[in-house]
């Protein structure tokens, strides 16, 4: 049996139809696993999210509106269909199992064992692909905010000495993207071999594996010590926050020799830099590492030069020189930036379940050869229950009505 081809049509259009014909059942909550489904849906897959009637544990997660509608939920679940079942009852669990078997692709963060174990689901569907997001490899729970602590980043973040958590659930988001990638890799393998299987993706492995890929493990094992706390400075190159004369705090990062030369010229620091180079016997022209190593001499020089200029003046000079910079601003500032949001083609209007109208993000990637469609809204809980049970399980209308009356199936 191959991947289940779409038989129904979701409301509206996909952002792109690159995954048209691929259907996925998703039973998940919080960030990582729903993100995998979101990315698949944005590229045209039919993603059917199955939840408890009334919503899962993240259905009212903050931020919420005054009416308690989750803005978080309605953005992480855009472009999906919704089936609501009473998963506390055997009949509801059996319906979910049947949907998974009928579809052939399953993304979840439910535990390895139990009624959604791969072994149980693969009975009668040996080519089933299950992608299971986990906390730790042994099945114990974890969250982004605890895994982040475990791999050491809070002890690198901020100026010290106390650990500093970052507020972006980066490991969740990276895990979700990797889960979507793993799903497509597994379908590619099945297309070549006919074999299904389970992919287990622990959040902790994504985190520590990423640390390793960035050279972090090798660095500390080679040196035998931890990297120093640098605040907002960038490790290994010239990059830091500075404050202008009109009190605008801006981040400046230099990654090429040309940018370095243009930064020096924009701030008229050629002679001062030459003096430091002569005194210390180094050249900063092409060496990121030397600029970082000698930051004790360079930072004060740049602090004074930048503090003597207004931000608008500096920004114009930096833009002319191709220097990478950006002022710090609030998320509300970002939301009101026309270039970033209002005039950005990844955003569009959607009929959101909350009733609140705001720019909705579609696929982040742009495919110039294809027309981008508007983002689709998130579904209401149970909005597609009748449609999916009819089309995917071939249940007659009378049987679906019985299940609804019995409280096994919910409709939105």
Give names to the regions the model predicted:
Residues 238-321, 325:
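Aromatic-enriched alpha-helical interface/lid elements that frame and gate functional surfaces
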Residues 351-402:
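Flexible, small-/acidic-enriched active-site or ligand-binding loops
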């Amino acid at each position: 049996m191959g991947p289940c081809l779409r038989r129904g049509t979701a409301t509206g259009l996909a952002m792109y139809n690159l995954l048209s014909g691929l259907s996925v059942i998703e039973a998940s909550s919080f960030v990582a696993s729903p993100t995998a489904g979101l990315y698949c849906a944005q590229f045209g897959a039919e993603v059917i999210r199955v939840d408890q009637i009334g919503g899962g544990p993240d259905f009212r997660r903050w931020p919420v509106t005054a009416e308690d509608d989750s803005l978080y939920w309605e953005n992480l679940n855009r472009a999906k269909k919704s089936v609501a079942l009473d998963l506390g009852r055997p009949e509801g669990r059996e319906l979910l199992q049947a949907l998974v078997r009928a579809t052939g692709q399953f993304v979840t963060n439910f535990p390895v064992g139990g009624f959604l174990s791969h072994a149980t689901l693969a009975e009668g569907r040996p080519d089933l692909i299950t992608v299971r997001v986990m906390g730790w490899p042994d099945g114990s729970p974890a969250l982004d905010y605890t895994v982040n602590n475990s791999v050491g980043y809070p002890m690198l973040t901020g100026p010290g000495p106390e650990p500093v958590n970052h507020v972006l659930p980066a490991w969740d988001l990276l895990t979700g993207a990797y889960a979507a990638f793993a799903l497509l890799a597994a379908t590619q393998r099945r297309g070549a071999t006919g074999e299904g299987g389970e992919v287990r993706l622990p959040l902790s492995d994504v985190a520590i594996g990423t640390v390793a890929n960035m050279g972090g493990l090798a660095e500390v094992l080679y040196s035998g010590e931890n990297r120093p706390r640098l605040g907002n400075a960038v490790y290994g190159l010239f990059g830091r926050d500075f404050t202008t004369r009109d009190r605008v705090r801006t981040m400046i990062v230099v990654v090429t020799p040309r940018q370095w030369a243009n930064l020096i010229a924009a701030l008229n620091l050629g002679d001062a830099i030459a003096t430091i180079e002569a005194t210390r016997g180094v050249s900063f022209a092409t060496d990121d590492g030397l600029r970082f190593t000698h930051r004790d001499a360079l930072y004060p020089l740049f602090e004074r030069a930048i503090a003597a200029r207004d931000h608008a003046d500096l920004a114009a000079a930096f833009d002319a020189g191709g220097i990478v910079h950006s002022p710090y601003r609030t998320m509300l500032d970002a939301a009101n930036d026309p270039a970033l949001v209002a005039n950005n083609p990844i955003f569009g209007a959607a009929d959101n379940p909350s009733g609140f109208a705001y720019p909705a993000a579609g696929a982040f990637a742009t495919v110039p050869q294809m027309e981008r469609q508007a983002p689709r809204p998130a579904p209401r809980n149970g909005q597609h229950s009748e449609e999916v049970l009819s089309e995917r399980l071939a249940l007659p209308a009378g049987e679906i009505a019985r299940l609804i009356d019995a409280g096994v199936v919910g409709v939105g």
